[in-house]
Amino acid sequence: MKRSERIDRVELMRTFVRIVEAGSLSAAARQLSTTQATVSRRLQSLETMLGVRLILRTTHTTRLTDDGERCYQHARRVIDSWLALEDEVGQTEDEPVGVLRVRAPHAFGQDQLLKPVTEFLQRYPQLSIEWMLNDRSADFLGDNLDCAIRVGVEVDPATVSVLLAEVPRSVVASPALLARFPAVTTPEDLQQFPWIAISSFYQRHVELFHDASPATARIAITPRLSTDSLYVARNTALTGLGVAVVSSWTVQDDIQEGRLVHLLPEWQPAALPVHLVYPWSRYYPARLRRFLELMRQVMPEVTGMRKPV
């Protein structure tokens, strides 16, 4: 009976931690794949067991009490220790099990990364992955994520960020658009064109770097279209709507087959860094550790990537 009670207490603490990190009982219930009534009942059981109120609830908000804040800090440590014990006793320290929740950018997530992720799952039959595609910054607690693949320089200093690779970029335009303007011979000539902006990376200016000298050029642009989608930028560039800066791998075939022109190839936008990002923790399960190893190994070899300079 005592063993059963201990397991129940761990489950109650897990539920409490999830309520705090998800921000509400309803969000915690969704992440735990249970009902809000069950989550509420577990919270009440933990409060009764401890003899204190942990969370103050109103119609619209939940707030930790002072006792709740102390309980959360202790419960977080207990859960981390319990997970480490389960790995060690269950002899799964090196064998990924359970569910790994990963957020990846739309472009990479539905294209280049699928093959290594599929092979990773075939290698570890007890592992499942929730592969969520989104270009926004990751909300690890609110969305119950284990890690995220981020493209770009903005990284939250409160997280662990591992540099995996970088993505070269190119300035491109359609032949039809170029035919309407004087020839492009300098970076300044690009200012005469309409542009397609990728709002995550550039909106009003584009900075270019000369590949054979320390020279740089900062170009003011006027976007006809702003988007957060790499594919939208590439596809609208093909229509002749404007000039775009895109990841080189997305337009390699278009350039080779003449659908797009690579402008000023000696002037390049800075390559975008690719990071694997995850929250700080005292304990990382085998599924996250193995996934990090996989990404470190395969990311620089993925089409369109290169090792960081």
Where in the sequence are the language-model features?
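The DNA-contacting recognition helix of HTH DNA-binding domains
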Residues: 36-37, 110
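Short helix-boundary/capping micro-motifs
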Residues: 17-33
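Short helix-loop hinge/linker segments at domain boundaries
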Residues: 59-62, 66-69, 80-103
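Central regulatory/effector-binding core of bacterial HTH transcription factors
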Residues: 97-160, 308-309
